[in-house]
Amino acid sequence: VDQLVKVAPAIIEMGCFARVETNGGGFEQVNLLFGENPNRAVREWTKPFHEAGIQTHMLDRALNGLRMSPVPADVRKLFYKVKHAQGTDITRTFCGLNDVRNIIPSIGYAHEAGMISQCSLCITFSPIHTVEYYVNMARQLIEAGADEICIKDMAGIGRPVSLGKIVAGIKKIKNIPIQYHSHAGPGFNMASILEVCQAGCDYIDVGMEPLSWGTGHADLISVQAMLKDAGFKVPEINMEAYMKVRSMIQEFMDDFLGLYISPKNRLMNSLLIAPGLPGGMMGSLMADLETNLESINKYKAKRNLPFMTQDELLIKLFNEVAYVWPRVGYPPLVTPFSQYVKNLAMMNVMAMEKGKERWGMIADDIWDMILGKAGRLPGKLAPEIIEKAEREGRKFFDGNPQDNYPDQLDKYRKMMLEKQWDKGQDDEELFEYAMHPAQYEAYKSGKAKEDFLADVKKRREEKANATAPVEAENKTKVLTVDVNGQPYRVTVAYGAVDPATLNAAAGGTPAAQTVAPVGEGKDILSPLEGKFFLVKNAQETPKKVGDKVAKGEVICYVEAMKTYNAIRAEYDGTITAICVNSGDSVSEDDV
């Protein structure tokens, strides 16, 4: 919060911004993960802009609200009431499937709260995402009461001329304000900005040094110079204030933000045109890629196979995205569906590199997308996907997606009363808990701040030691090893380790102290690397030692690449040990 409050006056002093994006999904979750209250952050961040007459702007994921999974209608409605009270003027609502049924309720919620409803067209490039497709979608949203339209070119792969035609087509329906949002990575967006402006676009999203270009927006200075030359009336930039803001952003990055930003994020890459993945997720993709590459090369090392390079894996991933995307119905590649398609492609690549078949692991959230529970897919599913769903007894859904998620605010009111937690000004704490239950609990307990500080310390040490020889990590792991056809359970440790540590490794929780006799029981191994969780939300009851489970029943989750992957029992039986704590990292084949 202190950084936001510090930089706001200099942003205002620049004198060139009509609007500033102040909050939304990423913003609020980052605050919670940082161990701070996002409600305080939004109020203090929006205040100076309001006082200066600059409109404030937030992002809304429609059915998903501010998170990666669907949100009950009562929570969505409270969301708008809270954010307007905190100082947000405009809501940019998008549905990752371009299903207007998910967007239209937000128009009503925005108007009821006194906000401007800006509805988005998620731009992608495919045989079905034509100019006519987008103009027709805009018509439906305008007829439903949208105040503005956003051309959300989140991957920067919209073709400039087509984007100009979309804007011109919308303006023929109604002279409504249009805002263009794009990312620079594939290389189209400067031409796209010029085309949409010539067609009548009113607002352009821009970035600034040192966070422009690459996976971010085109730079403010470049866009202003280009539009001025083209004859448009654009505001001047106070360059003295610009340099203040630039300096402060670099200062914040040097503090700790830079530890979470890959230098590769600033690179332009035309290879992004084919897979169409958005710039907003490329940073996390590159981080995930390192873990995925490590897993693949561990497999290859055990079999004396040549190692794979990161570039080789990246190209395989991009090729697999191109294979997967049409087969799952061409969902626009925007949060969360860009992550779903990318994760599905990565799981396929990893499986095939390890001698397995495609589609072996599909997370529940991805199944919800495939089955229609998140909205109507733009395209048709491949027969192989339909056959897999039917084989596993999964049911397709064509009703209103919101009907799948009943109201929950009363439940969270009761939980807050039991915990003696204040619902907050304008019910903002109630909203935060209902929107982000697990993250909010971690914030309230102090665990989020503790974990964040530990992670920053670790990253700083890794950065400092980047050129130093790397020693084996002093960490114990429980593995199952096959010797001449006989499975053995072993504990592996590196360096000087206390024998007590070895004994403790087999049981990370008190419940794990009850272990099956030697020779009895069967291990459940993690099929991938990630973080172990017994539940994925507050509605689930965690399994415990002594619980009976049936084959195929979900017993836990491994969170990888922002997706919770359900781990199912491979046998009927009784849980005799839980070998790791919730939130602990696990490697592939860990017990």
Question: What label would you give each PLM region?
Answer:
Residues S212-P235:
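C-terminal helical cap(s) of enzyme catalytic domains, especially alpha/beta-barrels
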Residues I12-V30, K264-L272, G276-G507:
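Terminal or standalone catalytic/regulatory effector modules within metabolic enzymes
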Residues P9, A18-M137, G156-P160:
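Active-site beta->alpha loop and helix N-cap motifs at the rims of alpha/beta catalytic domains
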Residues V515-V591:
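Structured functional modules or segments
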Residues Y133-M137, P186-A199:
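Catalytic cores of alpha/beta
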